[in-house]
Amino acid sequence: MALTKIEIAENLVERCGLDKRIAKQFVEDFFEEIRRSLESGEEVKLSGFGNFTVRDKKARPGRNPKTGEDVAVSARRVVVFKAGQKLRERVENAKVKA
């Protein structure tokens, strides 16, 4: 199961005692700020979590895996996330719920 923005807002309501409407708006504003920063080419560093960066990919030749036909893959910008050391350690040491 995936964690959603709604669930994040609900967790803020439970843990911090925020009003539900304020918690939802906080989550939306948080992600909007990350989007704006990435759109303008800025790196987003979240201490203890990881870094989001934007990279420019050059155009390159590719191949359609179904048909084997050669195709051109156009140049594009992509978002890259690199997990921080603390996050990597916590995920590595986490006990998986069955």
Swiss-Prot record:
InterPro entries: Hist_DNA-bd, Histone-like_DNA-bd_CS, IHF-like_DNA-bd_dom_sf, IHF_alpha
Top-level taxon: Bacteria
Presence of keyword Transcription: yes
One Pfam family it belongs to: Bac_DNA_binding
Assigned keywords, A-Z: DNA recombination, DNA-binding, Transcription, Transcription regulation, Translation regulation
Single Gene Ontology BP annotation: regulation of translation
GO MF annotation terms: DNA binding; structural constituent of chromatin
One GO CC term on file: cytosol
Gene3D superfamilies in alphabetical order: IHF-like DNA-binding proteins
Subunit comment: Heterodimer of an alpha and a beta chain.
Family: Belongs to the bacterial histone-like protein family.
Annotated function: This protein is one of the two subunits of integration host factor, a specific DNA-binding protein that functions in genetic recombination as well as in transcriptional and translational control.
HAMAP family in alphabetical order: IHF_alpha
Name of the featured protein: Integration host factor subunit alpha
